[in-house]
């Protein structure tokens, strides 16, 4: 397979042969941390790999960093990988791309119960799991240190647990939700 590699001010764009359905004139620029591949036009047959240079030495900051697409002035998360000097992503449309950081914790909010409340008469427990930027990739839940099955409703960003499984005990119960 033939691959075209473009270098613009330390950024790298890798395009496989036959990525585009039609011939395309690309005006590529990389200035002030923004990779501009031009206006969105036709869809791609396959994705393009972009690599944006970084000088992030702090491991937490690097873990929180990702390639984002600028859409109407807002940054949209793109699943990204990190290497020593680049953050890279596969993209499926032209546009503007930057390195961004997701430093806000996801929101985990009980819906039908409160902390320190009696849940004995409940059939299910519902919680909202929400992350506005990078999303929640996976989660696990524990009652009193024991793994508990929570089902996920993606349309409402809710997880729920059927209490008929007998995992809760009389008195105080501890619920822990771990997420990535």
What residue ranges belong to the model's regions?
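Exposed aromatic-hydrophobic patches
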Residues: 49-54, 85-93, 159-166
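Proteolytic processing hotspots in large secreted/extracellular or virion-associated proteins
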Residues: 22-71, 121
């Amino acid at each position: 397979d033939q691959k075209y590699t473009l270098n613009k001010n330390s950024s790298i764009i890798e395009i496989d042969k036959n990525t585009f359905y039609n011939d395309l004139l690309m005006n590529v620029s990389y200035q002030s941390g923004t990779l501009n591949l031009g206006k969105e036009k036709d869809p791609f047959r396959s994705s393009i790999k972009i690599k944006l240079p970084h000088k992030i030495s702090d491991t937490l900051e690097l873990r929180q960093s990702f390639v984002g697409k600028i859409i109407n002035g807002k940054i949209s998360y793109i699943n990204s990988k990190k290497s020593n000097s680049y953050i890279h992503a596969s993209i499926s449309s032209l546009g503007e791309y930057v390195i961004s950081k997701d430093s806000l914790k996801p929101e985990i909010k009980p819906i039908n119960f409160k902390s320190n409340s009696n849940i004995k008469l409940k059939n299910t427990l519902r919680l909202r799991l929400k992350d506005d930027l990078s999303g929640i990739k996976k989660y696990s839940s524990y009652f009193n240190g024991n793994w508990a099955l929570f089902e996920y409703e993606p349309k409402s960003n809710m997880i729920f647990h059927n209490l008929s499984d007998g995992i809760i005990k009389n008195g105080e119960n501890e619920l822990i939700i771990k997420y990535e």
